[in-house]
Amino acid sequence: YLPNYHKLQEESISGYVSVSAYGGYSCNSEYEFLTGNTLGFLPSGSAVFTQYLNDKQNGLVSWLNELGYTTQAISPCSEGLWDIGNAYEQLQFKDRIYNCQDRMSDIQYFNGNITDETIFRYIEEQYERHAGSPYFVWTATMQNHAPYDHPEGVIHEITFEDYNNPAAQEYLNLISMARTWLYFQRRITQDFDRLLSLFGATRALKRRR
């Protein structure tokens, strides 16, 4: 499954990422990735975006700003979620778009959330707007967010044998639904050097037998 994802693995450098967040607190994964800082010295249960991000933070975004990049954060969520309105400002994104669906047409939803495909089409529009100049975009999508109990809306191309875990099956099929964007990424990276980083911060699935 995930043929486009595995094709990208063959054509590029791939690996695994370990994050402090487990089954939640995705804002902490964002913070650690974008700054290179660890949450290892903060109390358990901390949410750095809402509790500790009160000043400008140097990291990947500020470095790319210095190199002349347009740095853009795109979110389908409101500024209040994990206080990303303040967080993305402190992380020094030049351009910040919240509730991005307000700027889109032909919006599709799944499980009450805007679909990955809709977000990716919008990213493609932004990419084309910045063609010919250095561009960095950061987004966190919501299509594959928990709960994983809406099988009627999922195309079940991946099935399990002798393993009863409907939530895990739905989760994998949701990831499979995102493969359209991976095809798009393969297409836009053919003529220019591009760095694509993909990782997930997801709810832990209860083990079943």
Question: Where do the PLM segments sit?
Answer:
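Solvent-exposed soluble domains appended to multi-pass membrane proteins
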Residues: 1-209
